[in-house]
Amino acid sequence: MAIVQNDTMIKAYNKLDDFNFPSAITSFSVLGEVYSEVMQVVVRSDLKDTVKTLADVKGLRVSIGDAGSGTEANAKALLAAYGVSTDDITVQNLSVNNSADAMKDGKLDVFFFTSGAPTTAITELQTAMDIYLLGLDDAVMDEFIANNKVGDYAVYAKMAVTHDQYACIPADAPITTIGVTATYIVSNSLSEDQVYNMTKALWESKDEIAKAHAVGSGMDINNAFVTIGNVPLHPGAAKYYTEMGLNVG
């Protein structure tokens, strides 16, 4: 069982685009979409007058996430949408925790991270130093969403990040960025009964998940398989959703 970004999941299942495996990976199926992940761009506050859009990061030290990660793929695509290549920046491939540490140490100017918000590393960083999250321009987001389908499937959407998620965002000025859904996938080797019980436990624990992390409040069973493309539901998950009155096709 794993949680994956839907864009990466569909690429893996169909061996699309920048997915560098020798063949498609079809040994898994979907348990359910659970929450939204947003593309977060964190910037040192002393750069606020100069870094107003992603186009302004040229010449800076930028972490684009772990090599081969969904964050790295998202960062490269977003930078390209603003006319920035990796040759225009000093690239670092750091995890979110290492990015936050490097920024605190004065060794990094900007970092990307795709995840549910809030993210602990960013929440803790904003208490240690002044930072801001960079919003994206509407026109660029519209073009990005239109031009970055995964195969035939639209997986990206505009999403807001607010003061309730990060105190460094003004209460009266939420930012808008690009989001993608995070999905639980399971091995096809698991039985129908096993995955049925796992799916049932997930959705019956929704309120407890929300108490543990804010992303749980956005869980909606009606969106459990909306943007999974051609990746199939596991039969056990499909059985549960059918019992809940959802049309699994």
Regions from the PLM with identified roles:
Residues M1, A77, N97-F111, T123-T127:
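Short helices/loops that flank or line small-molecule/ion binding pockets
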Residues M1-K58, D66, A73:
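Short, glycine-/small- and polar/acidic-enriched structural segments
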Residues T86-K104, G116-P118:
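Short helix-initiation/N-cap motifs at beta->coil->alpha
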